[in-house]
Amino acid sequence: VLAGTIENLRVQTQNRLFSDLNQQGTLWWRPLQHLSKTVDISQKAQSLHFDAESRERYFTVCLKNSTRLRKLIQWAQADKNKQRQMRILVIDDEADQAGINTCNIDAEEVSRINKLIRALVNGKNEDGKDIESTYLAMNYVGYTATPYANILNEPPEKGSLYPRSFITTLAVSKEY
């Protein structure tokens, strides 16, 4: 989960997810914190079980800042064999905050954080270059109540987080 720019809110989101995901069921969700190439051995990809038969699942809540995103990408790509086993769902909480491309689109510039999110989602290294290994699956879901910046700042182009058909309007619930 990509969650904002404030650490105490990141921790709050992680704790809420841990509590909500670990209800009754056969899966156990384990939080991984501040992932990087130098993380504790128990959180390195080589120590984790990504096979479909494993009852253990993993999640991390990462701040949308360039250092954390760069380290997350490096962690995910540190072990090529494990990377090929990873099924990743990136959930961009408040996708209109910090992650949108705020650079001049006519100059084909990309903001640093948007470039790193694109690299993660599109299977590139932290410099945006192709890598030798790919993930088993990669999906990106960005949600926000106000998607105007996402629509207007980033036209659908190669590598964009938002293809032409990225918006889905949800039906109004009966409780509304």
Go through the PLM ranges and name each one:
Residues M86-D92, N101-Y176:
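Conserved P-loop NTPase catalytic core
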Residues L2-G4, V61-K64, D92, Y143-T144:
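Short His-Asn-centered micro-motif
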Residues K37-I91, G99-I131:
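Conserved RecA-like ASCE ATPase "motif II neighborhood" in helicase/translocase motors
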Residues N15-L21, Q77-A78, R87-V90, S160-P163:
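Amphipathic alpha-helical scaffolding segments
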Residues V1-W28, A145:
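Conserved Walker A/P-loop ATP-binding site and its immediately adjacent core
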Residues N22-S42:
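Conserved RecA-like helicase motor-core motifs
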Residues L9-F18, L69-Q74, A98-N104, N150-P155:
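A short acidic (Asp/Glu
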Residues I6-L9, S66-R68, D96-Q97, T146-N150, ...:
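Conserved nucleotide-binding/hydrolysis micro-motifs of P-loop NTPases
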